[in-house]
From Swiss-Prot:
GO molecular function list: AMPylase activity; ATP binding; magnesium ion binding
Record-linked InterPro entries: SelO
Chain sites annotated for binding Mg(2+): N258, D267
Enzyme Commission numbers on file: 2.7.7.-, 2.7.7.108
Cofactor: Mg(2+); Mn(2+)
Active site (UniProt): D257
Name recorded for this polypeptide: Protein nucleotidyltransferase YdiU
Function (record text): Nucleotidyltransferase involved in the post-translational modification of proteins. It can catalyze the addition of adenosine monophosphate (AMP) or uridine monophosphate (UMP) to a protein, resulting in modifications known as AMPylation and UMPylation.
Keywords: ATP-binding, Magnesium, Manganese, Metal-binding, Nucleotide-binding, Nucleotidyltransferase, Transferase
Gene encoding the protein: ydiU
Catalysed reaction equations from the record: L-seryl-[protein] + ATP = 3-O-(5'-adenylyl)-L-seryl-[protein] + diphosphate; L-threonyl-[protein] + ATP = 3-O-(5'-adenylyl)-L-threonyl-[protein] + diphosphate; L-tyrosyl-[protein] + ATP = O-(5'-adenylyl)-L-tyrosyl-[protein] + diphosphate; L-histidyl-[protein] + UTP = N(tele)-(5'-uridylyl)-L-histidyl-[protein] + diphosphate
Comp. bias intervals (Basic and acidic residues): 466-475
């Protein structure tokens, strides 16, 4: 969607707030609550440059004032978005309880991005919450979202974190902070569920049309644009979850309000990256039943897309039975698309340029071997690309040795040279992920000692995840056994 006003202000903002022109039942107009003594904790200069902003200006007092909510930039129209969601399977009405969407910034190349403050004060959707956020979780989202971007995975980005100079009261007083999130949009499955719960058929049509115009204008040419929207959202979610699996990422809270229709990873609460391979891995303290465990993420994505399909039924077809038939036909494509993308990705991770029927068992047997021996997921796959395998207990295991011989034989049936396979593997198997103990180390230094050098060093390493970086080899190491099991928390 193109900007209607290309006026650029001093800091480089170029706001055109199309969502705020939608019916007001989708949001509430409200400014952020000012804070006492904001300071810049971290500022993403490279992202600022990419957005066409005046980086030098925003890195100083001007940025602190804007990113804290103390100053509304010219052209912004702050709103709090309404949405609902299925949280761990249970439906509830929600909304931005501690966030304000400043508006949509248009880059010099015509790209449109939401600029949202998170932790910016109470809203009509806050319920019993205080509308504030704690420094640790905001820095955590900054680290993980930027790492995901470097890994090549579609994600929201983090432009800045400011401290507020005010305590936030959880179990104990903690330093308050506000994150500035950059997203293609914040249209969620839960946004459609909010309208469906109210029986607002016209609202569903309006929001669906807006989503198509904003994100998928090519669908306007489809025979049934709303059905095409469902199929496109489904395919984007499959692709996203497959990419998560390939790097060992566990979102932790795949509620429908945390599924963005644009296909970006969003809301990095109790997320984490898997160390030793186990498909049942759960990190979130609130996921007691393992609903969002590593291997269950594809099924949960399909469940979420099904909830989206239900909201679209009134606009898919005038006849109810026909609408259900169309939706089910689209939803039925999920398993095959997932299997194809999953296998394509795993072939690349194993250096395979060609397809054979036995590739599925080759992949699964490796994962089973890794699980049985508690092998590190990231390091094992990365090290397979080496000419000589490291002398580790796992690589000496008879079960792995037998698998390795099968894999070597499979490689010989390709025309591509071995070095081409190794290059393919290095491009698809990161050497560096945000190791949980390294993330906690950086957060502790920032929160307890106000030392951001540990975090900055971690971000530097994570910005080049596919490079060997032998000088940073310690960042590849899994946590010592004494630090397991690792547990994450929501941070709300």
């Amino acid at each position: 969607m193109k900007a209607t006003d290309n006026t650029t202000t001093g800091p480089g903002w170029n706001f055109d707030n199309s969502y705020a022109r939608l019916p007001d039942y989708l949001y509430t107009r409200l400014d952020p609550t000012p804070v006492r003594a904001p300071q810049m904790a971290i500022f993403n200069s490279s992202l600022s440059d990419a957005l066409g902003l005046a980086t030098n200006t925003l890195a100083g007092d001007e940025g602190v004032a804007i990113f804290s909510g103390n100053r509304i930039p010219e052209g912004a129209q702050p709103i709090c978005q309404a949405y609902a969601g299925h949280q761990f399977g249970y439906f509830t009405m929600l909304g931005d309880g501690r966030a304000h969407l400043l508006g949509e910034h248009i880059t010099p190349t015509g790209q449109r991005f939401d600029i949202q403050l998170k932790g910016s004060g109470r809203t009509p959707f806050s319920r019993s919450g205080d509308g504030r956020a704690v420094l640790g979780p905001m820095l955590r989202e900054y680290i993980i979202s930027e790492a995901m971007h470097a890994l090549g995975i579609s994600t929201t980005r983090s432009l800045a974190v400011v401290t507020t100079g005010e305590p936030v009261y959880r179990e104990t007083p903690l330093p308050g902070a506000i994150l500035t999130r950059v997203a293609a949009s914040h249209i969620r499955v839960g946004t459609f569920e909010y309208l469906a719960a109210q029986g607002n058929r016209d609202g569903i049509r309006t929001l669906a049309e807006y989503t198509i115009h904003r994100h998928f204008p090519e669908l306007l040419q489809a025979d049934n644009p709303f059905l095409a929207l469902l199929q496109t959202v489904l395919e984007k979610q499959v692709e996203l979850v497959v990419r998560w699996l390939h790097v060992g990422f566990i979102h932790g809270v795949m509620n429908t309000d945390n599924m963005a229709l644009c296909g970006e990873s969003i809301d990095y609460g109790p997320c984490a990256f898997m160390d030793s391979y186990d498909p049942d891995t759960v990190f979130s303290s609130i996921d007691q039943d393992g609903r969002y465990a590593f291997a269950r993420q594809p099924a949960m994505a399909q469940w979420n897309v099904t909830r989206f399909a239900e909201t679209l039924l009134p606009v898919l077809h005038d006849e109810g039975e026909k609408a259900v038939e169309l939706a089910n036909r689209s939803l039925a494509t999920f398993p095959d698309i997932f299997q194809r993308l999953r296998m394509d990705g795993m072939r690349a991770k194993l250096g395979l340029f060609t397809k054979e029927d036995a590739d599925m068992s080759l992949m699964q047997d490796l994962l089973t071997c890794m699980q049985q021996n508690q092998a590190d997921y990231t390091n094992t796959l990365r090290d397979l690309a080496l000419e000589t395998l490291p002398d580790t207990p796992f690589f000496r295991e008879p079960s792995f040795t037998a698998w390795h011989q099968r894999w070597q034989t499979r490689l010989t049936r390709q025309e591509e040279p071995v070095e081409a396979s190794r290059a393919l593997m290095r491009a698809h198997n990161p050497a560096f992920i945000p190791r949980n103990h390294r993330v906690e180390e950086a957060l502790a230094a920032a929160q307890e000692r106000h030392d951001f050098t540990v975090l900055e060093k971690l971000l530097e390493v994570l910005s080049r995840p596919y490079d060997d970086q032998p000088e940073h080899a310690e960042y590849r190491q899994p946590p010592p056994p004494s630090e397991k099991p690792y547990q994450t928390f929501c941070g709300t």
